[in-house]
C-alpha cells in the first residue's frame, strides 16, 4: 500500500477486515468517507450502537436488540422450527414470507477440515429445545454446500430418534449457493416444496 497518514492506513486496515473488501475497495470507502465528513460521525455512532445493543437471542440465537427476539416472543407456530446456519439465512427466509414458524440459528455449519465440530455450533441448544414435546417438525434449511449437507445429515440423525418430523428445503435453491443471496420467490418455492428426510 502507498504511504498514507497513520489514521488513514489504520482505517483502510480495519475496512479490509470486512468480508469481500480488499485493499482497493477499502481505499475507495476511506476516500468516500473523507469526501463526506458528516457521514463519518453517523457511521461511527451506528457501529458503536450495534456493538452495545445487538446480541444473540437466548432462545433461537438470531441477532436482536430484545431478548427474546420478536419471533420467539411473538405468536408464531411454535410446533415448527426452521434450522439455519447464520442470521442472514433467517432474514432471507423471512423476506420470502413462506415460513410461519420459529427459528434456530446454528451460528455456522459443520466443517471438520476447518475444525468446526458440533460443539462449536448451537446444536446442543437445539436438542434441548426439542425435548419439551411441543415441536412437531424441524425444517433443516442449511445451505446446499458440503458443510451444509453434512450439518443437515448430522441433525437428521440426532433428531429422528425423538419422533419429530424432519424436513429439508426443496432443492429449488442452486447447489453451492447461500440463502442470503437467493431471491424471495425461489426461497418461497423451496420452503413450500420441502421434503421429509
Curated annotation (Swiss-Prot):
ZnF C4-type: positions: 57-72
Keywords on record: DNA damage, DNA recombination, DNA repair, Metal-binding, Zinc, Zinc-finger
Molecular function in Gene Ontology: DNA binding; zinc ion binding
PROSITE patterns the UniProt entry points to: RECR, TOPRIM
GO annotation, biological process: DNA recombination; DNA repair
Toprim domain boundaries: 79-174
CDD domains xrefs: TOPRIM_recR
Residue ranges of the TM segments: none
Source organism superkingdom: Bacteria
Record function comment: May play a role in DNA repair. It seems to be involved in an RecBC-independent recombinational process of DNA repair. It may act with RecF and RecO.
HAMAP family: RecR
Family: Belongs to the RecR family.
Matching NCBIfam families: recR (TIGR00615)
Protein name (record): Recombination protein RecR
Gene: recR
Amino acid at each position: 500500500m502507498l504511504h498514507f497518514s497513520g489514521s488513514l492506513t489504520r482505517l483502510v486496515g480495519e475496512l479490509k477486515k470486512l468480508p469481500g473488501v480488499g485493499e482497493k475497495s477499502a481505499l475507495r470507502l476511506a476516500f468516500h468517507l473523507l469526501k463526506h465528513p458528516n457521514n463519518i460521525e453517523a457511521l461511527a455512532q451506528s457501529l458503536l450502537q450495534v456493538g452495545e445493543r445487538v446480541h444473540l437471542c437466548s432462545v433461537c440465537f438470531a441477532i436482536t436488540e430484545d431478548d427474546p427476539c420478536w419471533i420467539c416472543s411473538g405468536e408464531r407456530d411454535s410446533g415448527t422450527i426452521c434450522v439455519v446456519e447464520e442470521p442472514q439465512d433467517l432474514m432471507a427466509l423471512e423476506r420470502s414470507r413462506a415460513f410461519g414458524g420459529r427459528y434456530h440459528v446454528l451460528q455456522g455449519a459443520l466443517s471438520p477440515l476447518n475444525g468446526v465440530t458440533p460443539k462449536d455450533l448451537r446444536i446442543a441448544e437445539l436438542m434441548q429445545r426439542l425435548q419439551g414435546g411441543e415441536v412437531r417438525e424441524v425444517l433443516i434449511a442449511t445451505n446446499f454446500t458440503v458443510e451444509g449437507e453434512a450439518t443437515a445429515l448430522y441433525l437428521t440423525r440426532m433428531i429422528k430418534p425423538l419422533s419429530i418430523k424432519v424436513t429439508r428445503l426443496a432443492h429449488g435453491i442452486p447447489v453451492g449457493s447461500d440463502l442470503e443471496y437467493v431471491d424471495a420467490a425461489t426461497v418461497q418455492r423451496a420452503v413450500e416444496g420441502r421434503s421429509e428426510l
